[in-house]
Structure formats: C-alpha cells, structure tokens
C-alpha cells in the first residue's frame, strides 16, 4: 500500500463542537472520514447523521457508542451495573451500524473495586456479548487497549500482546484492534515487530504523538510533533498489510480537566488542529516510504 493514507477525525477529541461543525472541520482539513460519537447525536436519528455524512462525502470510521466501556469508570458515561452497560452498548452498536462505519470502538473500562481476575473475566464475557450484537448488525468491532502507566480509569488490558490474549479469552480472536499510538508507544520492546505481525488485525490507527516527558494522560501531541517515531510505525503497518484509517485523536488539556497546559494543542482552533494533523500524517507517511526504501522493504 503506497497510496496516500486515509485520514479521519475522531469526535471524542472535538469536545466543543456539533456534528455539523465536525463535518465542516473534516472537509476543511482534507479528511475523508469521521468517527462519530453517539453522544453527539442529540435528537438526530442515525439515518439523519448518515445522510449528513453522505452529503459531505465522508465515510463513518471508528464510531463510538455513548457507553463505550464494559466496566464502569468515573471518566466514562453509563450506569454502574455491567449488565446495563452492555445492553446500552449493544443498542449503540445497532444505532451506529446504520452509518455503515468501518468499525465500532470498545474498551474494557477499569477494574474498580473488582479483583483484577474477576474484572477481566466480566469484561471478556461482555465483549463476547457485544461482538455477537455487532455480528448481527453487520459491523466490525475495534477493541482498544491502554497504556499501563495510566490504567486506573479506562482499562484492564494493556498493550498489543495483552489485547490479543484478552480477545482469545473472550472466545472472539476475530475481533479487530484499535491501535492508539500514544497508548502503545513504549509498551513493548517488540512494538515495531508486533505492529507488523498484527497489522492485518488492526481496523483503525488512532493518530497522535507522544510528548517526552508526558505530563498526564491528556498531554498528547499532533502527529510529527513528538517522539513516537511515526515513520517506523507507519512502515511496519504498511509492510504488514494495514490499509485502514488514521483517525486523529489528540487529547490535550486546556484546563477543562484540571491541567491548564500553556502549550495545549486544544488552545488552537479545531480546524487548525485538524489541518496540522493531516500535514503531520503526510510528512510522516512520506518519511516512512523513504525509510522502507532504505531498508529494501
């Protein structure tokens, strides 16, 4: 795959805007896809949102249910009861499937007060249920693992190897992966090798970069502005056969979450962020082609 990479925007990282505004930002930045957050539907139905995307020439990419984790978290919407959460997630999958997205995102959520083994077991059972609902709706899932250094509010699964093990435990090794660059950077000494090996299982790459040192979980950078080594990652993805979307998702606290970083990316206009994200992707992509040529790959 040497054609230009497919670029999309994730609505989770556009917290102040409407779907209409996000569509304008996507088109203005050169993106051809948008990962819709069900939480932004408001009083619109899925068919309304699908029509808006179609009119703008945008593909629905890795869409996000209003409840996106199996286990409850203070940072993630939804009830405390796991069964109720999973039921709402299944409803979200059915609604989002009407957009014909490339996939729908899910994650475990944190263990909370549950013993770690019990939390993992409950999450695996929930994933199995959600995957069945996704099968019925005709849409793939993308399962996201998290960064081990900041696990308490989002996940019980950390890194690519743990993610594939978890999916096997759930009896659904066919479920695809969400590859978040910020979360996976530094997760394994074999990251590039694993990226190449698992590329066929990756549905979407969440595009961002890593500040070093990272101050908090919401201190991410636009692609090309950090130390993640995007060209090597992109080369490995391409060599492994990945042909999916690069979905811009940069969380950078401007004060709303308690860390008012003076250099927060979120202090930039949303359209400027999206344009710079696209430019950074293309620069790193071209560098990855040059890297592969030097390596003879």
Segments the model singles out, each with a brief description of its role:
Residues 25-44, 64-68:
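N-terminal substrate-binding region of glycoside hydrolase catalytic domains
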Residues 44-63, 123, 139, 264-267:
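Short acidic, glycine/proline-enriched helix-loop-strand junctions
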Residues 35-54, 110, 114-115, 150-151:
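Glycine-rich, proline-tolerant flexible connector loops at the mouths of alpha/beta enzymes
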């Amino acid at each position: 795959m040497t054609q230009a990479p497919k670029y999309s925007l994730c609505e989770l990282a556009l917290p102040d805007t409407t779907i209409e505004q996000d569509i304008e930002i996507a088109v203005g930045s050169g993106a051809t896809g948008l990962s819709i957050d069900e939480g932004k539907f408001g009083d619109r139905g899925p068919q309304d949102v699908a029509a808006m995307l179609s009119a703008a020439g945008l593909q629905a990419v890795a869409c996000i249910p209003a409840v996106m984790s199996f286990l409850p978290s203070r940072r993630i919407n939804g009830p405390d009861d796991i069964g109720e959460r999973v039921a709402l997630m299944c409803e979200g999958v059915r609604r989002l499937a009407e957009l014909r997205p490339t996939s729908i995102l899910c994650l475990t959520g944190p263990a909370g007060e549950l013993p770690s083994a019990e939390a993992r077991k409950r999450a695996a059972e929930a994933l199995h249920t959600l995957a069945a609902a996704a099968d019925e709706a005709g849409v793939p899932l993308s399962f996201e693992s998290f960064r081990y250094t900041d696990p308490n509010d989002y996940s019980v699964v950390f890194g690519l190897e743990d993610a594939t093990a978890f999916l096997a435990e759930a009896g659904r090794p066919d479920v695809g992966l969400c590859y978040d660059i910020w979360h996976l950077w530094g997760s394994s000494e074999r990251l590039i090798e694993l990226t190449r090996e698992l590329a066929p299982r990756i549905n979407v790459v969440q595009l961002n970069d890593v500040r070093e040192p990272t101050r908090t979980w919401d201190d991410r950078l636009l692609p090309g502005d950090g130390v993640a080594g995007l060209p090597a990652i992109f080369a490995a993805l391409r060599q492994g056969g990945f042909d999916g979307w690069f979905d811009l998702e940069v969380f950078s606290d401007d004060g709303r979450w308690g860390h008012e970083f003076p250099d927060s990316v979120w202090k930039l206009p949303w359209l400027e962020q999206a344009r710079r994200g696209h430019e950074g992707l293309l620069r790193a992509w071209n560098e990855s082609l040059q890297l592969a040529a030097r390596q003879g790959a």
